[in-house]
C-alpha cells in the first residue's frame, strides 16, 4: 500500500505538467492564429495594393454599370471612364442617364458611352432581350451590379407592403442575376473579366426592421461566392463588395463621417483593392475595401460575433429609433400640408 501511494504521489506532477503543456500549446496556437488574422487584415486594409484593372480587360473595352444614374453607380461610371474604359450606363430614367453620359464625355473626352433605360422591377423580358442585342458586339470587361432597392423606412416585416417586398427582391436579386447571366458568357469566352456586386453589412448582420432587404443582400453574398468558384477557371473574377453606410439617396444620409464615406471615396477604395479581402479575408470572393468598414467587419466577425444576440439587439434598437424619427418627420410634413 505504501508503495502504491508513493507511485501515485510521484506520477501526479508529470501528469499535471503534460496537461498544462497541452493547454498552453492550444492557447498559444489560438493566440497566434488570431494575431496572424489581425495582421493580415491590417496589411490588406492599409498596405497591400489590389489587382490592376488592366488584368480584366484593356483600355477601350467596356464596363457595364447598373444603377448608374446617381450615387455609387454614377461614381463607378466616372472613375472607370477616367481609367480608360467605355461605359454602358443602365438604369431606369433616360434623362438621368443622359446627364451622366454628358458628364463622362466632358471629363473623359476619348471615352465612348451608351445608355440603356430599363426598370428592373418590371422584369420585362423584352428589356433583357434588347440589352442582349446591344452588348453582343461589345467587349465587356467589367460588370458592376450596383442597382438596388431598400425599404422606404425601417419597417417590421409583417407591416411591409407587398409591393415593397416584391420590389426589393426583383431589383436586388432577380435583376442582378439576369444581368450577370447576359454578360458572363462573353467574359468566359474571352477568358477574362471582373464582376463586382455591391452588397451591404445588412446582408452579413441580421437587421431587424430591414428583414427583406437584409435577406436579399445575404442571398447575393452566397450567390457571389458560389459564382466565383464557377467562373474562376475561365479567368473571370467575381467579387462581392461589402460596405457599411454611404452618403446616398438610399441611405438618406447627407453628411459624411469616418464610417460613412461619400460615393467617390468608396469607389476609389474598391477599384484600388480588387482581390483584397480586407476585414473579411475568411470569406471567399468578398472584400470590404473602405478602411473603416474593413476594421468594422473584422471586429464584427472576429470579436463581437456578427450573428450574436448583442449585435442583433443593437441593430434592432438602432432601426427602431430610426423608424420612430422617420414616422415623426412624416407626421410633421403631413401637418404642414394640412395647414
Curated annotation (Swiss-Prot):
A GO molecular-function annotation? very-long-chain 3-oxoacyl-CoA reductase activity
Record keywords, A-Z: Endoplasmic reticulum, Fatty acid biosynthesis, Fatty acid metabolism, Lipid biosynthesis, Lipid metabolism, Membrane, NADP, Oxidoreductase, Transmembrane, Transmembrane helix
Predominant location of this chain? endoplasmic reticulum
Which cellular component terms (GO) are annotated to the entry? endoplasmic reticulum membrane
Q: How does it sit in the membrane?
A: Single-pass membrane protein
Task: Show the stretches that span the lipid bilayer.
Answer: 19-39
What Gene3D superfamilies does the database record attribute to this sequence? Answer: NAD(P)-binding Rossmann-like Domain
* Domain of life of the organism encoding this protein: Eukaryota
Q: Which reaction does it catalyse?
A: a very-long-chain (3R)-3-hydroxyacyl-CoA + NADP(+) = a very-long-chain 3-oxoacyl-CoA + NADPH + H(+)
| Pfam families according to UniProt | adh_short
UniProt binding sites for NADP(+): 64, 105, 119, 127, 146, 213, 217, 246, 248
Q: What class of enzyme is it?
A: oxidoreductase
Active site at 213 (proton donor), 217 (lowers pka of active site tyr)
Question: What is one GO biological process annotated to this record?
Answer: secondary metabolite biosynthetic process
PROSITE patterns hit by this protein = ADH_SHORT (PS00061)
The text of the family note is: Belongs to the short-chain dehydrogenases/reductases (SDR) family.
What's its job? Answer: Component of the microsomal membrane bound fatty acid elongation system, which produces the 26-carbon very long-chain fatty acids (VLCFA) from palmitate. Catalyzes the reduction of the 3-ketoacyl-CoA intermediate that is formed in each cycle of fatty acid elongation. VLCFAs serve as precursors for ceramide and sphingolipids.
Q: Which PANTHER family match?
A: HYDROXYSTEROID DEHYDROGENASE-LIKE PROTEIN 1, VERY-LONG-CHAIN 3-OXOOACYL-COA REDUCTASE
What is the name of the protein in this document? Very-long-chain 3-oxoacyl-CoA reductase
Q: Which organism is it from?
A: Ajellomyces capsulatus (strain NAm1 / WU24) (Darling's disease fungus)
Amino acid at each position: 500500500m505504501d508503495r502504491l501511494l508513493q507511485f501515485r504521489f510521484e506520477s501526479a506532477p508529470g501528469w499535471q505538467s503534460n496537461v498544462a503543456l497541452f493547454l498552453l500549446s492550444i492557447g498559444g496556437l489560438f493566440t497566434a492564429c488570431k494575431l496572424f488574422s489581425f495582421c493580415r487584415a491590417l496589411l490588406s486594409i492599409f498596405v497591400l495594393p489590389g489587382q490592376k484593372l488592366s488584368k480584366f480587360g484593356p483600355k477601350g473595352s467596356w464596363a457595364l454599370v447598373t444603377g448608374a444614374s446617381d450615387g455609387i453607380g454614377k461614381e463607378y461610371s466616372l472613375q472607370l471612364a477616367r481609367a480608360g474604359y467605355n461605359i454602358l450606363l443602365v438604369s431606369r430614367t433616360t434623362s438621368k442617364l443622359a446627364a451622366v453620359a454628358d458628364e463622362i464625355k466632358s471629363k473623359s473626352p476619348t471615352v465612348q458611352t451608351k445608355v440603356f433605360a430599363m426598370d428592373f422591377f418590371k422584369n420585362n423580358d423584352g428589356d433583357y432581350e434588347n440589352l442582349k442585342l446591344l452588348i453582343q458586339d461589345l467587349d465587356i470587361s467589367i460588370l458592376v451590379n450596383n442597382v438596388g432597392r431598400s425599404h422606404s423606412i425601417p419597417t417590421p416585416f409583417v407591416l411591409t407592403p407587398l409591393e415593397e417586398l416584391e420590389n426589393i427582391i426583383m431589383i436586388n436579386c432577380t435583376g442582378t442575376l439576369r444581368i450577370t447571366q447576359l454578360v458572363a458568357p462573353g467574359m468566359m469566352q474571352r477568358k477574362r473579366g471582373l464582376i463586382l456586386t455591391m452588397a451591404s453589412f445588412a446582408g452579413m448582420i441580421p437587421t431587424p426592421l430591414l428583414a427583406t432587404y437584409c435577406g436579399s443582400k445575404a442571398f447575393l453574398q452566397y450567390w457571389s461566392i458560389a459564382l466565383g468558384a464557377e467562373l474562376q477557371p475561365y479567368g473571370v473574377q467575381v467579387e462581392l463588395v461589402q460596405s457599411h453606410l454611404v452618403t446616398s439617396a438610399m441611405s438618406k444620409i447627407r453628411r459624411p463621417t469616418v464610417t460613412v464615406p461619400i460615393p467617390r471615396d468608396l469607389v476609389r477604395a474598391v477599384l484600388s483593392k480588387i482581390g483584397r479581402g480586407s476585414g473579411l479575408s475568411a470569406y471567399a470572393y468578398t472584400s470590404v475595401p473602405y478602411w473603416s468598414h474593413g476594421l468594422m467587419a473584422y471586429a464584427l466577425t472576429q470579436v463581437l460575433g456578427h450573428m450574436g444576440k448583442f449585435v442583433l439587439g443593437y441593430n434592432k434598437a438602432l432601426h427602431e429609433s430610426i423608424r420612430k424619427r422617420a414616422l415623426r418627420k412624416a407626421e410633421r410634413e403631413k401637418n404642414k400640408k394640412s395647414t
